[in-house]
Amino acid sequence: VLEKAKNGTNDFLILPLFFGRSAAIYEYLPQRMEEIQKQCGQFDLKIAPPLVDLDDSNNDDVAQILADLVREEISYNKLDFPSVTLVDHGTPRIKVNEVRNFIAEQLALILKDEVQCVKPSSMESREGEEYSFNKPLLEEILGSSKFERDVILSMLFISPGRHAGKGGDIDKICAESRKKHSALNTFMTGLFSEHEGSIDVLNKRLNQGLETEFI
């Protein structure tokens, strides 16, 4: 943005690749834009909505994609009524955690006749009661009631990395859980960005962003 503003561009639209209203986009970014405007002069800025709108219960396009990815695992591995946990990274912000729970509820409705149950979990959490909203942790839910046998991890991650990628932190948590629970089998879905429908969701948010007010 700084380089473009220096070269005379005065109209910007930010398209967040975030499931929820990350502080990085909706708090830090406007502050950073103000600093750039002091250097380069005024310009117009819009920020498109995140991928998930908590205020619209009919906004289930992300959940539909995650459901498709779960179905792929069921079909490929020939699973019979597995349990599903929607797992995210974990967060210090309860508003971000609400996105996890919101999608888990939608996923449970979409898959109600295809899986045993759907429950949310987080990979990790900061210590302290004030962060207990992240519970249950993935390591706690694996091997627990209804999660003792075939469990699909619906991955609430945009793209692979040291957490969601092969051999990453979640892979290691699953491996440790399988050692503790001999009947447990775990299956990780593909990621949101790997589904062709993710482009349609981004395009929809782009168009919504064009209709928003300047900040």
Stretches found by the model and what they are:
Residues 1-215:
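Extended amphipathic ligand-handling, pore-lining, and cofactor/metal-binding catalytic surfaces
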